[in-house]
């Protein structure tokens, strides 16, 4: 391995004993061998530590470094520790229950060199519980400015995930994943995009994302206060740059507000429980009809959903349930 690897692959591990070895194998099978793998064990209560140790003892690889944190600290803390330890020029953050396809690094770096982008996003395959796959790409293939990418991210026109892209590590100087209970990926990515010169999107599925009910955002109800903290984070990120007062910036923040409360409402409707009615009521008042009408013009699906949530939660529940079944095959 070169003194400075091209890519640092940061993989948090928590309660994924059944999948983590396959995830590690998918990294070690990369056609681009110039990487380091940082395995960040987050106080995992299962036998992940033992399985990883046994595998690496049988298959030693100098590119792999394991950090065994006995106390659970959360996903953001693990990624931040990985960033502190990373030596690569680029970083990526696969989950330990997913898999990289063999050419993940090779193809993303090819497009980075071709376009000069500081972030390259790829498509991914969603692998359902029955083994079927569906290709998904959020965004239009091509290259955007960092500002354009930031606004597109807020409007849900680009992938908000940490695992389907490579990012120049220099963009994380002064940037870390916040301790927020939802969308911490999107928060850090927004800050990176606001620093980036250009961002490229490619229509090549290079990542396999395992879909399960527990892995989706509606597997639990996020407290309303966390949604407010998320929106405050978005606003402060734009305020630190010249983008906050731009009309496009304000539009993006408005649409992000509608989307954030829609997502929170979806959790309440699907999960249910004692807290659901209060959360649902807070989501319905979290954005205005004017906000929804603006979203209707720019992001029609979200605008229509926002207006529907404000007028008929029963119909909204029915339509969203049909959407989940169609998209995720659950």
Roles of regions detected by a PLM:
Residues 9, 82, 139, 150, ...:
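Sequence-pattern detector for short linear motifs
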Residues 188, 230, 257:
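Catalytic-loop motifs flanking and including active-site residues across diverse enzymes
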Residues 206-212, 219-248, 262-291:
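Catalytic core of nucleotide-sugar-dependent glycosyltransferases
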Residues 166, 238-243, 306-314:
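Juxtamembrane/interfacial segments around transmembrane helices
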Residues 253-263:
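Amphipathic alpha-helical repeat scaffolds of TPR domains
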Residues 1-227, 308:
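Nucleotide-sugar donor-binding/catalytic module of glycosyltransferases
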Residues 249-250, 312:
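Residue-level recognition of alpha-helix termini/interfacial anchor residues
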């Amino acid at each position: 391995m070169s003194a400075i690897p091209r890519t640092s692959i940061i993989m948090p591990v928590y309660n994924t004993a059944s999948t983590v070895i396959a995830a590690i194998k998918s990294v070690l099978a990369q056609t681009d061998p110039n990487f380091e793998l940082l395995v960040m064990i987050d106080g995992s209560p299962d036998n992940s530590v033992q399985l990883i140790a046994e595998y690496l003892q049988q298959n030693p690889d100098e590119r792999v470094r394991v950090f065994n944190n006995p106390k659970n600290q959360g996903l953001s803390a693990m990624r931040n520790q990985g960033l502190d330890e990373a030596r690569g020029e680029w970083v990526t953050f696969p989950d330990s229950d997913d898999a990289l396809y063999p050419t993940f690094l090779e193809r993303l770096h090819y497009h980075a060199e071709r376009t000069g982008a500081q972030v390259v996003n790829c498509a991914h395959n969603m692998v359902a519980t029955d083994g079927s796959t569906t290709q998904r790409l959020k965004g239009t293939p091509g290259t955007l400015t960092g500002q354009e990418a930031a606004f597109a991210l807020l409007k849900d026109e680009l992938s908000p995930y940490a695992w389907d892209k490579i990012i120049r590590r220099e963009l994380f100087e002064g940037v870390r994943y916040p301790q927020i209970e939802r969308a911490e990926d999107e928060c850090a990515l927004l800050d990176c995009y606001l620093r980036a010169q250009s961002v490229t999107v490619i229509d090549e599925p290079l990542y396999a994302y395992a879909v399960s009910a527990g892995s989706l955002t509606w597997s639990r109800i996020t407290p309303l206060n966390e949604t407010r903290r998320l929106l405050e984070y978005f606003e402060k990120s734009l305020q630190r740059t010249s983008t906050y007062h731009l009309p496009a910036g304000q539009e993006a923040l408005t649409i992000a507000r509608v989307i954030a409360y829609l997502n929170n409402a979806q959790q309440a409707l699907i999960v249910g429980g004692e807290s659901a009615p209060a959360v649902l009521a807070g989501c319905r008042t979290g954005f205005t009809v004017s906000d929804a009408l603006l979203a209707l013009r720019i992001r029609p699906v979200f605008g229509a959903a926002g207006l529907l949530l404000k007028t008929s939660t029963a119909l909204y529940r029915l339509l969203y349930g049909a959407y989940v079944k169609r998209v995720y095959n659950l």
